[in-house]
Amino acid sequence: MKTFFKDMAERAIKTFAQAMIGALGAGATGLIGVDWLQALSIAGFATVVSILTSLASGIPGDNTASLVNNKKEGE
């Protein structure tokens, strides 16, 4: 279960960063022109979606937040 939450946190942090970068570059030409509240709102929503996706993808007993089985055959 510990691995699941580590995976989920890693995905959520990456998603937040990616969404923030996308929101910042979408319409602003400089730091002053950025609508920071909107950018944080977009990144926050993307993070919530990431967490919900991880929870929905978690297979009991798999201990990861991935829907795909990453174990090699024979493990």
Swiss-Prot record:
GO cellular component terms listed in the entry, alphabetical order: host cell plasma membrane; membrane
Main location: host cell
Membrane topology according to the record: Multi-pass membrane protein
Keywords from the UniProt entry: Cytolysis, Host cell inner membrane, Host cell lysis by virus, Host cell membrane, Host membrane, Membrane, Transmembrane, Transmembrane helix, Viral release from host cell
Pfam families attached to this UniProt entry: Phage_r1t_holin
Locations listed in the record: Host cell inner membrane
Residues that span the membrane, as ranges: 16-36, 39-59
Role according to the record: Accumulates harmlessly in the cytoplasmic membrane until it reaches a critical concentration that triggers the formation of micron-scale pores (holes) causing host cell membrane disruption and endolysin escape into the periplasmic space. Determines the precise timing of host cell lysis. Participates with the endolysin protein in the sequential events which lead to the programmed host cell lysis releasing the mature viral particles from the host cell.
Protein name, UniProt field: Holin
